[in-house]
Amino acid sequence: MTLNKLYFDGGEEIRDLTIVGGGPTGIFAAFQCGMNNISCRIIESMPQLGGQLAALYPEKHIYDVAGFPEVPAAGLVESLWKQTERYNPEVILGETVTRYRKLDDGSFEVTVSSGKVFLSRALLIAAGLGAFSPRKLPQLNNIDDLEGRSVFYAVKNISDFVGQRVVIVGGGDSALDWTVGLLNAAAEVTLVHRMHEFQGHGKTAREVLEAKESGRVNVFLNTEVRSVDREGEVLTAVHLRSKSGKSRRIEADRLLLLIGFKSDLGPLAGWDLELADNALVVDSHMKTSVDGLYAAGDIAYYPGKLKIIQTGLSDAAMAVRNSLTYIKPGEKIRHMFSSLKGAKEKRNAPDNG
């Protein structure tokens, strides 16, 4: 018997918890469900698990997750799933949750974009920042057909930039990270930022400036991209203009626009839940303004919230733990240390030898 069948009332359609969002927070929430012996399903709008890490930054390295001095985004997602998959959570990909309804018995019904309906005893929103789309430069209105060929908004495959003359636009962490990350792959790297100083991590900013001093990267501050040159479907150059009015033409094969993403709560915004800072307000138990409906990760707001992966994982653990009293009212909730549970699972595992 799998954990997905422990608390069913007879049908296999209902789960104890539906998790909306399959990023790191959502995956770890599913792991916590397994640790707490409740069934769950993950509903993810993208065609794969991992959220923005998988969709936008699979080759980006992350440095602020406890226990990992350095880990590629795709590697972190893979590790989280490896940790979780032994509990066999139901996973539904490529479906967006469009509405929810709390039923008279306190359970929840969610409807997805295809019209399918899923039932669960509680609901956890772990949808990150909601739907996201890259910020674009309004003055570049002739590059849509170059996107994915010569113009990019994220680095999904470093091979797209190997041996190419790359112009990177931005001054935050992503722009700085990939300026450093592409130095040994690209034929030439140029970083353009419209402000007079970088907004990204100080250590990476120093690496960029050191690379500039050694002639490995071109850096233009107080400068904007004004237009591009192209030959058919091929980018050939980028035109820059500084705030002082100086113009410059940079020959380029790739334009990498790393100026952030616009987030949109989408259907969540109309769910009649309390909002603050474009997120769902939660209490100390990660519960929203609706009893039985929880939120975790970037989509959850509480005073002092720090939007990093580590916090999302902690949110997920608290949300699942606190949902138990709603899912199984009247039952005494006992905490089991992971070391003890792991040992118990090993003892109960079938002997394949």
UniProtKB/Swiss-Prot annotation:
Catalytic activity: 2 reduced [2Fe-2S]-[ferredoxin] + NADP(+) + H(+) = 2 oxidized [2Fe-2S]-[ferredoxin] + NADPH
Keywords: FAD, Flavoprotein, NADP, Oxidoreductase
EC number: 1.18.1.2
One GO MF term: flavin adenine dinucleotide binding
Cofactor: record remark: Binds 1 FAD per subunit.
Cofactor: FAD
Assembly notes: Homodimer.
Classification via HAMAP family: FENR2
Family membership noted in the UniProt record: Belongs to the ferredoxin--NADP reductase type 2 family.
Protein's recorded name: Ferredoxin--NADP reductase
Organism per entry: Pelodictyon phaeoclathratiforme (strain DSM 5477 / BU-1)
